[in-house]
Amino acid sequence: MFPNGAPIGVPDPEETKALTQSRYDRRMDEDLYWEVGLLLEKLRQGLELGQAIISNETVGSMRSKEFEFSDDGEWPWFYNIHGAGLRRDTEIPTKVWFSLETIFNHRYYEHITHLYNIQRIKLAQGLNTTVEVPIEGYMALPGWDLSTP
C-alpha cells in the first residue's frame, strides 16, 4: 500500500495487529481505547490516514487496487450498494475482494449513518440539529430504519 513507507502517524505494527485481532468487529476495544482524548486521537489518526491514501491515488488506481476480505453472508445488502467495487472470489465462496474505492465509499456511508443516528439521539433529547445528513448509501436501502423521535 505504501511503496515509499507508511505516512507519519499511522498505527505501528503492534497496534495494527491489536486492532485487526480485536474481539470487536464494529468498534474499538474498550479495554485499550476508553478515554475520550485517546478516542479523539484515534479518530484524527484514521482520518489523516485516509487523507494520506487519497492524496496519492487517482480514481483509476483506487478502482484497480483490491483487498481480500472474508464474508460469511452477514451483509447481503452490501452488494446492492457497492456494485463492481466488490466481487466474490470464483473459487472460495466466503472470500470477497473490495476495491480501494469501495473501502472509501464504505467509510463515507458509515460516517453519515453514524451522524444521522447521533442526530436522532439529539432530537430525542430535545436538542436541535443544524446540518442535514444526506440519505444515501446504506440509509437509502429499502427497509433501513430512518425513524425519528
Regions found by a protein language model. Give the residues of each.
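A hydrophobic membrane-anchoring alpha-helix module
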Residues: 106-125
